[in-house]
Swiss-Prot record:
Its main location: membrane. It comes from Bacillus pumilus (strain SAFR-032). InterPro entries: UPF0154. It comes from the Bacteria. NCBIfam families: PRK01844.1. Keywords: Cell membrane, Membrane, Transmembrane, Transmembrane helix. Pfam families: UPF0154. Belongs to the UPF0154 family. The keyword RNA-binding does not apply. This is UPF0154 protein BPUM_1692. It is found in: Cell membrane.
């Protein structure tokens, strides 16, 4: 085989692998976020009410900030 054919096949295979990997990772992340949605203020407020706490906006903001800092 000519050298340029080998190089062309290698580049095409590499691009196909990158594209396939991207779409597989995207599908995985979409399903993961659907199963485990990120916690927002409304969910936090409901959790606090279920635990018998009165959720003040200050307390919710503190908890959201703490969770965001922990995620970093």
């Amino acid at each position: 085989m000519d050298l340029w054919v080998v190089i062309l096949v290698g580049v095409v295979a590499l691009l196909a692998g990158v594209a396939l990997g991207f779409f597989i990772a995207r599908k995985y992340m979409m399903s993961y976020l659907k199963k485990n949605p990120p916690i927002n203020e409304q969910m936090l407020r409901m959790m606090m009410m279920q635990m018998g706490m009165k959720p003040s906006q200050k307390k919710i903001n503190q908890m959201m900030k703490a969770m965001n800092n922990q995620a970093k």
